[in-house]
């Protein structure tokens, strides 16, 4: 499967995808989507648009000079088919890709190394130039503390209500037990009285 690269943004163009424009001199231009085709027709410069690979390479955001990138160059030299050569080539391609990814990660980490300190310096300068921001921050913190305190109070009230409900339920259960005991005693007394009356009548 032959995978071409977009003439404008350098994205991969897979078979049955993209747009191809053939100029009068038989030069082919392949585009990954209509956005790139439209920009090409408008004669836009890819180095001036931030979403293209050309801009990222020109701005130093991507790895440009590296030995692993030379393996991707096209070589129009016919080579006689050899099974062992194909196997070793495939293994080498996988290894080269792994090395390239490692170097790209290292390049990115090296490029992003001083960003944290720069951001802190910018924030410090912003606060020094606009001291009213600290007051706004104090107000926000105070409101946050008030909301937290209100939430805790509401939770405490809910817990107290639950405890009161449990206590009232316990009291009601105790009253019911007392009533049931008193009813049982009264029934016992009635049975005893009936037995006494029966014994008197029999006498």
UniProtKB/Swiss-Prot annotation:
Coiled coil: none annotated. Residues 147-203 are annotated as: Disordered. Disulfide bonds: none annotated. GO terms for molecular function: ATPase activator activity; ATPase binding; structural constituent of ribosome. Residues 191-203 have a biased composition (Basic residues). One of its GO terms (cellular component) is preribosome, large subunit precursor. One of its GO terms (biological process) is assembly of large subunit precursor of preribosome. InterPro entries: L24e/L24_sf, Ribosomal_eL24, Ribosomal_eL24-rel_N, TRASH_dom. The keyword Nucleus applies. Residues 155-184 have a biased composition (Acidic residues). It comes from the Eukaryota. It is found in: Cytoplasm; Nucleus. Keywords: Cytoplasm, Nucleus, Ribosome biogenesis. Associated with nucleolar and cytoplasmic pre-60S particles. At the end of biogenesis it dissociates from cytoplasmic pre-60S particles and is likely to be exchanged for its ribosomal homolog, RPL24. Involved in the biogenesis of the 60S ribosomal subunit. Ensures the docking of DEHA2D15950g/NOG1 to pre-60S particles. Activates and recruits ATPase AFG2 to cytoplasmic pre-60S ribosomal particles. Belongs to the eukaryotic ribosomal protein eL24 family. PANTHER family: 60S RIBOSOMAL PROTEIN L24, RIBOSOME BIOGENESIS PROTEIN RLP24-RELATED. This is Ribosome biogenesis protein RLP24. It comes from Debaryomyces hansenii (strain ATCC 36239 / CBS 767 / BCRC 21394 / JCM 1990 / NBRC 0083 / IGC 2968) (Yeast). The gene is RLP24.
């Amino acid at each position: 499967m032959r995978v071409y690269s977009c003439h404008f943004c350098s994205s991969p163009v897979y078979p049955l995808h993209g747009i191809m424009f053939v100029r009068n001199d038989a030069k082919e231009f392949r585009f990954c989507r209509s956005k790139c085709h439209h920009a090409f027709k408008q004669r836009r410069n890819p180095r001036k648009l931030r979403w293209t690979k050309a801009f990222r390479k020109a701005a130093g955001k991507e790895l440009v000079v590296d030995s692993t990138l030379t393996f991707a160059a096209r070589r129009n030299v016919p080579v006689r088919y050899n099974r062992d050569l194909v196997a070793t080539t495939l293994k080498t391609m996988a290894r080269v890709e792994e090395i390239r990814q490692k170097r790209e990660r290292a390049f990115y980490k090296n490029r992003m190394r001083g960003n944290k300190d720069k951001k802190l310096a910018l924030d410090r300068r912003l606060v020094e130039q606009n001291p009213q921001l600290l007051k706004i921050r104090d107000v926000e913190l105070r409101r946050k503390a008030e909301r937290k305190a209100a939430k805790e109070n509401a939770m405490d009230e809910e817990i107290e209500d639950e405890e009161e409900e449990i206590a009232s339920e316990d009291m009601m259960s105790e009253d019911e037990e007392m009533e049931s005991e008193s009813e049982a005693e009264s029934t016992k007394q009635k049975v005893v009285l009936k037995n006494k009356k029966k014994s008197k009548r029999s006498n």
